[in-house]
Amino acid sequence: MSNLKLWDSVCVTDPAMTKKANVGGNKITSIKPQYQIKMATEAFGPYGTTWGFSDIEYNYSLEHYGLVVFKATFFFPEGEFVISNSIKIWKDNAKTKLDDDFAKKCETDALTKALSKLGFNADIFMGYFDDMRYVEQAASMTAQKSAPKQAVDNSKLI
């Protein structure tokens, strides 16, 4: 088995599942978390049983700096590794508005970082999304890949 088999199967990102953002003055391409979870579920199986986080810890020792540190073990069928992340817990610099979604945001960001180590959405992290020609090719490639799938009949949902 090729060491890059998983990487090669998950490295191309559907541009429709991304959006441009400005974070701290940096222009980035963010990936929709549910898209990442779907990709990982396709590769590994259901979240929480065959892949996900275990031993989750939130460390508040840097709280006086406005930071909380997330640490967990990311597991998947081929192994596991420790991942950590930090996030600001305040919505403002005056430290008057607590971000009550900080834990969810921190875990989601850690999931993105963990999956990126395995090659998920590697084209974004390798800077390919800065090239519009690449983005157009990725859109074409992902459209062809998903075309054979059956479309959802929305009339049955009403």
Identify the function of each model-found stretch:
Residues I31-K32, Q36-M141:
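Positively charged, aromatic-enriched nucleic acid-contacting surfaces
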